[in-house]
Curated annotation (Swiss-Prot):
Keyword entries, A-Z: ATP-binding, Ligase, Metal-binding, Nucleotide-binding, Queuosine biosynthesis, Zinc
Task of the protein: Catalyzes the ATP-dependent conversion of 7-carboxy-7-deazaguanine (CDG) to 7-cyano-7-deazaguanine (preQ(0)).
Higher taxonomy: Bacteria, Pseudomonadati, Pseudomonadota, Gammaproteobacteria, Lysobacterales
Pathway info: Purine metabolism; 7-cyano-7-deazaguanine biosynthesis
Reactions performed catalytically: 7-carboxy-7-deazaguanine + NH4(+) + ATP = 7-cyano-7-deazaguanine + ADP + phosphate + H2O + H(+)
Cofactor requirements of the protein: Zn(2+)
Protein name: 7-cyano-7-deazaguanine synthase
Gene name of the record: queC
Provenance organism: Xanthomonas oryzae pv. oryzae (strain KACC10331 / KXO85)
Length: 224
């Protein structure tokens, strides 16, 4: 069976991506990164998703981006209730580049020629590393920088959610049997994975379920 490394954050998008990769016949190797994120319960969610969706292996890599800083997700910076103009403070500098590079390294080790990530350019928070141009550029890099690329096997970077709305992602996940109740999206999630209901991630997630006409399985700490 062909193999793929899938970035798994523990959120709803990456859970849907695993299911989509499996539907395409890939044996999934899920990679999560403990990068110093304040909402560490997403890693607990990643473990739940990996177990529930039957991945071949789930690896958690430690890369402490707090030493670099520059984000409300790693530093002592308040997470805003809503996104504003420009790139938000929840952007983690070069995060997707770093994570995809780690996934690329593991792909070489396990013999996978395909990487999957859950980046989205429709209902998203304005991060530069979620754009189609970034995904295409990273695929070029992957083929220039690896043994598989140089030897002609070719590496592909898949972003199957790139042009889907959050509602579309919910519908696809439901179609594929994804249990979104296992996932955590909130930037302020507590240790038990309960969501704040107010941050940008929570608002996008709630709107996705509402627009899809699907009951929201999110566990909230605060309702208002």
């Amino acid at each position: 069976m062909k193999k793929a490394v899938v970035l798994l954050s523990g959120g709803m998008d990456s859970a849907a991506v695993i299911a989509l990769a499996q539907e395409q016949g890939f044996a999934v190797y899920a990679l999560s990164v403990r990068y110093g994120q304040r909402h560490t319960s997403e890693l607990d969610a990643a473990a739940r998703v990996a177990a529930a969706q039957g991945v071949v292996a789930h690896k958690v890599v430690d890369v402490d981006l707090r030493s670099i800083g520059g984000s409300a997700l790693t530093d002592d910076i308040d997470v805003p209730d809503a996104g504003g103009d420009g790139i938000p403070v929840t952007y983690v500098p070069a995060r997707n580049t770093i994570m995809l590079s780690l996934a690329l390294g593991w792909a070489e080790v396990v013999g996978a020629n395909d990487l999957f990530c859950g980046v989205n350019a429709v209902d998203y928070s304005g991060y530069p590393d979620c754009r189609p141009e970034f995904v295409r550029a990273f695929e070029v890099l992957a083929n220039l920088a690896t043994k598989a690329g140089v030897e002609g096997a070719g590496l592909r970077v898949h972003a199957p959610l790139q042009f889907l709305s959050k509602a579309d992602i919910v519908r696809e996940g439901v179609r594929l049997g994804v249990d979104f109740g296992l996932t955590v999206s909130c930037y302020r999630a507590d240790a038990d994975g309960r969501a704040c209901g107010h941050c940008d991630a929570c608002r996008l997630r709630a709107a996705g379920f509402a627009d899809a006409g699907v009951p929201d399985p999110t566990h909230y700490a605060i309702l208002s």
